Amino acid sequence: MLGFSDQYNYDEEFKPESVAHMFVTKAVVSRNPRDDVKGKWVIVAIYGQFRILGFAREGDKVWTDIPCPSRCYDDVVFYEGKFYAVDCHGIVIVCEIDDPKSTVIAPAPVGTRDTIQKYLVESSGDLLLISRERGGRLFEGGIDDEILPRYYTKGFSVLKLEKNNNAGEEEDEAKYEYPFCWIEVKSLGDRALFLGRNPSVSLSASEFEGLFKPNCIYFTDDNEENFYFEPRGGGGLDMGIFNTETSTIEPHFTGEYRSPISPPFWYL
């Protein structure tokens, strides 16, 4: 089993269930290790108390950290032969594995906040940035209403990564500094997105007729930092289907979630 570097600096002891979310938040592989393809596969993981990035190649004995301009990464994806990651502020980087380093390629979208969960997903050849806004007592300051859930999802916004043709111009350094920029996406068309603790996935609804709805975002409760502390209003209940056309949310699971330490995930 591969070992990570020590990322846990605590002076007191914690119960296992209270720190379970601090080990590996998410892991993405460059290809299926079982595929008969030349070249070794690579896996990149978000791990540790500060959610930093590390990678391992096929045959490695230890993980290697990827130097990054920030920490607290929300998601990572393998897209067009490279690994991309987004931090809690919405800044996107591309990771180099052969000579471990990272480069910022796109700024944080206007209006984003570190309290908004970010996801990266490839959909129809495009790289999308999905922002998930939460409400509830935990995220809306000044609210002290025991009836209101601790947290719940209010909605999503979708942006597409596009090449910035004005990059390098001196008229507005802040605007043209990065090689890529964000374009708003108002419709997913035939696609449905599946977001959560697992790697994000985009599927065609017409290819799986009757199984799920097009132009929708299916999401699970992946708020690990607060998942364990209050079963009512959290802990597996913040799940649903967001319609990008109507901006409405409907439930997809109404049963009782039974695991106190393991957030739900998609099995696709």
Model-identified regions with their sequence ranges:
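A sequence/structural signal of beta-propeller blade repeats
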Residues: 1-141, 156
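C-terminal closing repeat unit and adjoining cap/tail of repeat-based domains
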Residues: 42, 147-268
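Short, surface-exposed loop/helix-turn segments at secondary-structure junctions
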Residues: 142-146
